Design a protein with these regions (language model features):
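Secretory targeting and sorting signals
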Residues: 1-30
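Short linear recognition/processing motifs and adjacent strand/loop elements at protein termini
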Residues: 29-193
Length: 193
């Protein structure tokens, strides 16, 4: 008798589970197609060096970060038109002017060496962003890929950052106009390959 009751209960539970996993969704409920989530994050950027633009006198005025569905983003905003950058993965990221390696002080399994072809100071040589060389300038707590953003200084019109990431992952760099007369150099680092 016990065996019969156990078999009936097991059969009933399996039947409910089968119906629950194979029944069509309720009206109006979205069902993603197979592979749709993976396709939505189909990143084709690669992890090779990226460089563009030219030297500008527009000062860097803000550094911020954001989380997105498929990537994490660092935004470098300038007061004026700035289009120049060099970004690459590196074993060492030297500070501007002194050459002190930032990697030992930057969290992450891999490090992007970001050089902006614009100063982080104005025409009077006053700093235009908060933070000194070696400071962690953006809070990236709970980000999927970003681990750290460290200011590497600004010297003779060049500004450096060490961006620590979870691992060597694809990235892209985009130059965007605005807001207003400002411009932005945007670094996106994918969550996965």
């Amino acid at each position: 008798m016990r065996r019969s009751v156990r078999n009936v209960i097991t059969t009933a539970v399996l039947g409910v589970a089968l119906v629950a996993t194979t029944s069509p969704p309720a009206s109006g409920q979205a069902v993603p197609a197979a592979g749709q989530a993976a396709a939505a994050c189909a990143i084709t950027w690669g992890s090779g060096d990226k460089a563009a633009g030219r030297l500008s006198s527009a000062p860097l005025v803000e550094v911020r970060a954001g989380r997105h569905a498929c990537y994490d983003r660092v935004v470098f905003e300038f007061d004026g038109s700035a289009t120049g950058y060099r970004v690459r993965y590196a074993a060492q990221v030297p500070t501007e002017g002194e050459g002190v390696d930032l990697v030992p002080y930057t969290a992450g399994g891999a490090h992007l060496w970001v050089t902006l072809l614009a100063p982080a100071y104005d025409e009077n040589h006053e700093a235009t962003i908060a933070g000194a060389t070696g400071d962690h300038v953006v809070n990236v707590l709970r980000f999927d890929t970003l681990r750290d953003v460290v200011f590497g200084g600004s010297f003779e019109g060049y500004t450096t950052f060490a961006v620590g990431v979870r691992a060597r992952l694809p990235f892209q760099v985009t130059v965007l106009p605005g807001p207003g007369t400002h411009s932005r150099v945007v670094l996106d680092v994918a969550h996965q390959w």
